[in-house]
Amino acid sequence: MVHFVGAGPGAPDLITRRGAALLQEADCIIYAGSLVNPALLGLAKPECAVYNSAEMTLEQVLDVMRRVEAAGGTTVRLHTGDPCLYGAIREQMDALDADGIPYDDTPGVSSFCGAAAALNAEYTLPTISQTVIITRMEGRTPVPEKEKLASLAAHGATMVIFLSIGLIDKVQQALLAGGAYTTETPAAVVYKASWPEQKVVRCTVGTLAGSTRANGITKTALIVVGEFLGTRYERSKLYDPTFTTEFRKGAGQ
């Protein structure tokens, strides 16, 4: 059995209880060493075999899974954040399907949630934004033509940009090229959300690249953009005393 487990954004205590239990029971752990907090490996039993997938190819990862399965053991494939976002899990699951090896998936707290927590922010403010776009800038890995950053930026929605801090100048240019954001649109860079070395840089789209460089941030950071970072919004209808819900009648109704 292979368990794909989300490690959370960084802080060891942000892994789910299920994820922690699976780590404690695993015969083998293959973890994304470039991003997963190594403190989580302290949950492993002494005899557990541990592999750092940052040093491995897909084929090598699968070979380890097959060997453990053949020996009757269980493997935890530990991914950063939540495995469903930029986790490259589909290709692993397809290979396991072909081999008849069972697997399941335990979600984790994504770093985009960790970034919102670091900012004490709500991505979906009434009348400001009810849409969150999660994307990345094209680099060595291409993106579909219809998903170019400038095209997505044209919506003016809340945007969370992964894996792009090393292309910050191009990110800034693409955001402005979309036409919906201006140089004054609020933005922020969150470095290593929930880690002890977490850093939050608040800026605007127009100062995004310069602020990132001034703070020495070159990797392991998310870029967030949108008016949700500003001060304007309207009160939620959910807790408005005049609003009727399934559980409560509005005043005067």
Where are these regions (language model features)?
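Short secondary-structure transition/capping segments
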Residues: 43-44, 63-64, 116-120, 136-137, ...
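A generic local structural motif
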Residues: 13-18, 37-38, 62-63, 120-121, ...
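Class I SAM-dependent methyltransferase SAM-binding "motif I" and its flanking Rossmann-like core
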Residues: 84-155, 199-202
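Structural recognition of alpha->loop->beta junctions
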Residues: 26-27, 95-102, 126, 208-217
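A contiguous loop/helix-start segment that scaffolds small-molecule binding in enzyme catalytic cores
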Residues: 2, 60, 71-75, 131, ...
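Class I S-adenosyl-L-methionine
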Residues: 1-109, 114
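Short secondary-structure boundary/capping segments
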Residues: 20, 42, 67, 124-125, ...
